[in-house]
């Protein structure tokens, strides 16, 4: 118990029987979790109210002194059940519209990473950086086969090459595909964007803590769809520059 209290254990990978979000690492994901919690509050409130009304109707139906066949209309209750749901929907809609706009907005990114989906692996390009040969940094990332996994590596999640990003840096991901539709999704970063052939989609992320984040292709793309993991290592700026010099 003391270990759990004194050490923050963050969840950046899928867990067995998980029923909630992974721990967030970007403002976008924080907003998604907050919106989810707010909507769940209204859903639980509505569920309890409707359940209580249904229980009361069934329980007291035989005690009703006014038979329902003589009840021709109820203007007050009709106004209530028309206006109240509309108000609840508006309360839910406005925050969701704001969050949707913020998630799509990309303003002055510090760097750009291009992710291209192929059957069944990812290719990444760092177009802002050029190596000694005058070429942009690019590499391919494949899932590590189960028989080659080392201790501590995750089945169908670890890759032979990782995307490396600096912490606290505004990063733009440009996502596309070379064959069929894929989907670039990292839950902890609040990223989920379709990778479509012939189209460039973009999303931004401000990753606020170092760590290793896992994602998957979230669009059925063929027989090896489950073998398209995404692994992102977030390091300090100094470590990122060291990694760049090694490429």
Swiss-Prot record:
Q: What is this enzyme's catalytic activity, as reactions?
A: 4 Fe(II)-[cytochrome c] + O2 + 8 H(+)(in) = 4 Fe(III)-[cytochrome c] + 2 H2O + 4 H(+)(out)
- CDD domains linked to this entry: CcO_II_C (cd13912)
Q: GO cellular component annotations, sorted alphabetically?
A: mitochondrial inner membrane
Please give the InterPro entries that the UniProt record associates with this protein: CcO_II (IPR045187), CcO_II-like_C (IPR002429), CcO_II_C (IPR034210), Copper_CuA (IPR001505), Cupredoxin (IPR008972), Cyt_c_oxidase_su2 (IPR014222), Cyt_c_oxidase_su2_TM_dom (IPR011759), Cyt_c_oxidase_su2_TM_sf (IPR036257)
Which residues are involved in binding Mg(2+)? 219
What's its EC? 7.1.1.9
User: Its domain of life?
Assistant: Eukaryota
Q: Name one GO biological process term.
A: ATP synthesis coupled electron transport
Q: Which UniProt keywords apply?
A: Copper, Electron transport, Magnesium, Membrane, Metal-binding, Mitochondrion, Mitochondrion inner membrane, Respiratory chain, Translocase, Transmembrane, Transmembrane helix, Transport
The entry marks the following residues as binding Cu cation A1, namely: 182, 217, 221, 228
Q: How does it sit in the membrane?
A: Multi-pass membrane protein
Q: Where are the transmembrane segments?
A: 39-59, 79-101
As to how many cofactors bind and how, the note says: Binds a dinuclear copper A center per subunit.
Quote the subcellular location field of this record.
Answer: Mitochondrion inner membrane
- Which residue ranges are assigned to the Mitochondrial intermembrane compartment in the record's topology? 12-38, 102-247
Which modifications occur after translation, per UniProt?
The signal sequence of COX2 is processed by IMP1.
Q: What family is this? A: Belongs to the cytochrome c oxidase subunit 2 family.
**What is its biological role?**
Component of the cytochrome c oxidase, the last enzyme in the mitochondrial electron transport chain which drives oxidative phosphorylation. The respiratory chain contains 3 multisubunit complexes succinate dehydrogenase (complex II, CII), ubiquinol-cytochrome c oxidoreductase (cytochrome b-c1 complex, complex III, CIII) and cytochrome c oxidase (complex IV, CIV), that cooperate to transfer electrons derived from NADH and succinate to molecular oxygen, creating an electrochemical gradient over the inner membrane that drives transmembrane transport and the ATP synthase.
| PANTHER family hit by this protein | CYTOCHROME C OXIDASE SUBUNIT 2 (PTHR22888:SF9), CYTOCHROME C OXIDASE, SUBUNIT II (PTHR22888)
Protein name from the UniProt record: Cytochrome c oxidase subunit 2
The record lists the organism as Cyberlindnera mrakii (Yeast)
At the highest ranks, the source species' classification is: Eukaryota, Fungi, Dikarya, Ascomycota, Saccharomycotina
Q: Which gene encodes it?
A: COX2
């Amino acid at each position: 118990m003391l270990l759990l209290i004194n050490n923050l254990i963050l969840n950046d990978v899928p867990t067995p029987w998980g029923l909630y979000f992974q721990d967030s690492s970007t403002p976008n994901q924080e907003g998604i979790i907050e919106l989810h919690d707010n909507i769940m509050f209204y859903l639980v409130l509505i569920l309890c109210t409707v359940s209580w009304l249904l229980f009361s109707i069934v329980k007291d139906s035989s005690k009703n002194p006014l038979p329902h066949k003589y009840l021709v209309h109820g203007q007050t209750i009709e106004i209530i059940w028309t206006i109240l749901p509309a108000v609840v929907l508006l309360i839910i809609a406005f925050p969701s519209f704001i969050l949707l706009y913020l998630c799509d907005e990309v303003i002055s990114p510090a760097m750009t990473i291009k992710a291209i989906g192929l059957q069944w692996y990812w290719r990444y390009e760092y177009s802002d950086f050029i190596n000694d040969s005058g070429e942009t940094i690019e590499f391919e990332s494949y899932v590590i086969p189960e028989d080659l996994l080392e201790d501590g590596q995750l089945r169908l999640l670890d890759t032979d090459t990782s995307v490396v990003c600096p912490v606290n840096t505004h990063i733009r991901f440009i996502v596309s595909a070379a064959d069929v539709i894929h989907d670039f999704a990292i839950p902890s970063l609040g990223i989920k964007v379709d990778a479509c052939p012939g189209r460039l989609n973009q999303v931004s992320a401000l990753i606020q803590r170092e760590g290793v984040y896992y994602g998957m292709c979230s669009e059925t793309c063929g027989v090896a769809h489950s073998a398209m993991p995404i692994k992102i290592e977030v390091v300090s700026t100094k470590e990122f520059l060291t990694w760049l010099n090694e490429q």
